């Protein structure tokens, strides 16, 4: 007789993981990057982050209470705070407060709560908010303050980012290559950009913490970074006067932030290890294609959102093994 019992009877021992525990673990991993942004951007970083987090918490509470008629305890699980921090990390430090609030409203209201809240959203809410602001306010979203203006906010002096210089080189301005910071500067954070782009080292510290705590696995971030390195390396070998080295591609822009904190979102990424690898490779390829051949200097946000849409399809063809399933005898 076939044994149909594929899961053992109770009682079961709880593993200790919970949504709230993992969310606050991610927040701890974000602390190094936040401290670095404070060091380089000062008041602007504090205002942008505080406004984004407060707005996300408020809209999560208000929409849940008055529109969805759901319990408002979800504001305590940490997901809205993470959305606020990640949205802030995708914004320049001189962005006006009212634009930040609009981004938070779109991220929470459209990107998350309109689908039913945490666990139901098909797209990363923070990235949805960033792309909405980028398309709606392109001038404000591409004005990057120069690092070191600790007390300046909206009146901060702006300058070109490494990705903007790379794009100029692709368009034929060979002098732009000499203006791109070296790898050490990009690693430490001495360059302009969004709050979360300034230091690859701080983001790698966060990655190490999350891997240590087993909040995420290595499959998505490593597959993204390796794919970008290989693809960008091929392009650099083909035309080194036009395309920068793969190391500079890895350390510049929002690649590290996206690979570590955005693409690894539980809700919008595949469940199986095989699916994660496919997902990560596709994000890496799309990012390089958009960076080198697209209209925008940065392609990470668009690449992740595109692959978010393919996550259900990847899950369909890369189903994880069911717990307790017995392998078929050959």
Go through each PLM region and give its residues.
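Membrane helical hairpin/interfacial module
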Residues: 35-87
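Structural signature of hydrophobic alpha-helical transmembrane segments
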Residues: 43-55, 94-103, 186, 190-200, ...
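C-terminal ends of transmembrane helices
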Residues: 58-70, 108-119, 205-214, 260-269
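Membrane-interface helix-loop-helix junctions at boundaries between adjacent transmembrane segments
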Residues: 86-155
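Loop-to-transmembrane alpha-helix initiation sites
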Residues: 122-126, 246-254, 276, 294-307
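Long hydrophobic alpha-helical segments that form multi-pass transmembrane helix bundles
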Residues: 125-204
